[in-house]
C-alpha cells in the first residue's frame, strides 16, 4: 500500500497514478480492504483511470464487507445524501454510520452522535451521543475538537450535559454540569483530545 500511496502523491517525484492503480488492483484482488477502498476512490473520481462509479461502489461495498471503516462511513454518506446514483435511504445510512462508529471511525462517531442528538437513531439517547463524541475526541479527531469548541450549540443541551458528565467521569473536568461549553469544559475537551495545558 505504501508504494501505491507514494505514486498517488503529486508532490512526489514517484507520482505515477497508473502504477498506483496496478498496485492497488493487485492488493484489492487479493482481498485487501484498504486497497479496495482506495481503488474505489480513484474510480469514483476518475484519477488515472476512466471514471466508473459502479465499479467504485462495488469496491466500496467489498471493503465495507471486510469491516473497513472508511468505506462503511462513505457508504453511510452516499445512502444519506443519495450520491453516486444510490437512492437515499436514511435508515440504511444510519446503520452504516453506526457500524463505522462502532469500529471507532472518528468522522462516523461524530456524525452518529449528531444523528442521535437529532433524535433519529432509535434506541439511542444523549448519553450515547456524548459517549461517541468523547470517543471521537480520544481518537485524536482534530475536526471534532474544533467543532465542539467553535460551534458547541450544534448539539442540544442534553448531549452537552452528558458530555460534561463523561468528562467528569474520567477526571478531565471538575466544573458545573450546566451544558455550557465554557473555559473549563473547553479545557476538558482539549484534554480528552490529548492536549495538555
Spell out what each predicted region is.
Residues 25-29, 61-65, 99-102, 135-138, ...:
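Conserved structural position within tetratricopeptide repeats
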Residues 2-9, 38-45, 49, 59, ...:
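Hydrophobic face of amphipathic alpha-helices that form TPR/SEL1-like repeat modules
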Residues 35, 71, 86, 108, ...:
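TPR alpha-solenoid repeat register
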Residues 1, 8-11, 29-32, 45-47, ...:
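Short helix-capping/linker turns of helical repeat alpha-solenoids
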Residues 85, 121, 152-166:
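Alpha-helical linker/edge segments of TPR/alpha-solenoid repeat scaffolds
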Residues 157-158, 168-197:
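Short acidic, glycine/serine/threonine-rich helix-capping segments at coil-helix boundaries
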Residues 95-98, 102, 110, 114-117, ...:
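TPR/TPR-like (Sel1-like) alpha-helical repeat modules
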Residues 12-23, 50-59, 86-96, 123-132, ...:
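Structural signature of tandem alpha-helical TPR/SEL1-like repeats
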